[in-house]
């Protein structure tokens, strides 16, 4: 939205208007895939630690502070947190394509309702959440009364939806951003449980690699599949939390390298396997990186590994002063190796 406003200001000075209601790409993309139809699931209180009614109450209190009568939320993570449901519309993210309008006494949810199960429908009805077709959001936004005041987050709202509003607009960060960032006691305990489950799976994986790399052919891709399978053994596993990054040997020097059929290599004696992976569970998501040494490695590899470890250890112990940038802290990492 913010970028659109900037274009509007610059182009308006030259008498150029922005046509935001025409999707030119849609007109020429003949084989455009349809939107996801994957089902959603409700996240119960034992995982969230707070029910939908409580969250809506807190959001409405913040709306009142802004003097807002309606609040449009276009960010998927905020909507998922607010209404306590998750989905699988985006690879590796438990999110659902939707929009939400919070009003004083009701909520409008714009979503493909074929994704919703009975448990979600029950909870939505209990909290006076009205369900509408996903694509109706733009026309319905135009129908918001001119006497209403809409709270929107300019960093999380697209330009077309913003321009559809006929009422007064108050700009501010979505209240849900800070709310979901502050974890309650139930969430904290669940995060610990998710990390414990993930640690069990990763420990089994490292043991398996070390015991079998010289007895059977293990590649980067088959190692990824094995770790995913071990995570899936844990209760509450949903999916990997991002694309597994299994990098062996020189591949480990490449930032965010992910193996493919074209680049896949076999794990061998004398190398190191870098595993940057994560698991998604009902309790939370993990992101963990570990390096596994296969057999005996050269003094040179030991030197480089130790240098990286010492750099991270030193940097992690530093006090990050307000206003610091990454480049100003880089010296703390490099000085451990005299560079």
Task: Describe the function of each predicted region.
Residues 1-339:
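Active-site neighborhoods and metal-handling regions in enzymes and metal-associated proteins
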């Amino acid at each position: 939205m913010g970028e659109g406003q900037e274009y509007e200001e610059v182009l308006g000075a030259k008498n150029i208007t922005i046509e935001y209601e025409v999707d030119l790409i849609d007109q020429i993309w003949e084989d455009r895939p349809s939107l996801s139809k994957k089902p959603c699931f409700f996240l119960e209180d034992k995982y969230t630690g707070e029910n939908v009614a409580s969250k809506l109450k807190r959001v409405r209190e913040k709306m009142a502070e802004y003097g807002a009568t309606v609040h449009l939320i276009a960010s998927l993570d905020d909507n998922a947190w607010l209404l306590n449901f998750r989905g699988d519309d985006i690879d590796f993210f438990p999110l659902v394509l939707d929009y939400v309008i919070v009003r004083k006494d009701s909520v409008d949810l714009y979503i493909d309702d074929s994704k919703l199960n009975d448990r979600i429908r029950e909870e939505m009805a209990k909290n006076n959440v009205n369900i509408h077709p996903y694509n109706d959001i733009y026309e319905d936004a135009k129908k918001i009364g001119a006497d209403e005041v809409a709270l929107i987050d300019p960093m999380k709202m697209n330009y077309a939806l913003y321009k559809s509003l006929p009422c007064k607009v108050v700009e501010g960060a979505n209240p849900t951003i800070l709310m979901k960032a502050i974890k309650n006691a139930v969430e904290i305990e669940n995060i610990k449980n998710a990390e414990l489950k993930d640690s069990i799976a990763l420990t089994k994986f490292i043991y398996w690699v070390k015991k079998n790399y010289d007895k059977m052919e293990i590649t980067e891709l088959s190692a990824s599949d094995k770790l995913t399978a071990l995570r899936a053994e844990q209760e509450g596993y949903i999916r990997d939390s991002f694309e597994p990054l299994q990098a062996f040997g020189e591949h480990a020097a490449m930032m965010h390298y992910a193996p493919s059929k074209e680049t896949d290599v076999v794990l061998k004696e004398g190398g190191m396997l870098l595993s940057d992976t994560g698991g998604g569970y009902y309790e939370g998501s993990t992101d963990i990186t570990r390096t596994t040494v296969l057999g005996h490695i050269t003094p040179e590899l030991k030197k480089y590994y130790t240098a990286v470890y010492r750099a991270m250890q030193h940097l992690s112990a530093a006090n990050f002063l307000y206003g610091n940038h990454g480049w100003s802290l880089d010296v703390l990492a490099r000085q451990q190796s005299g560079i």
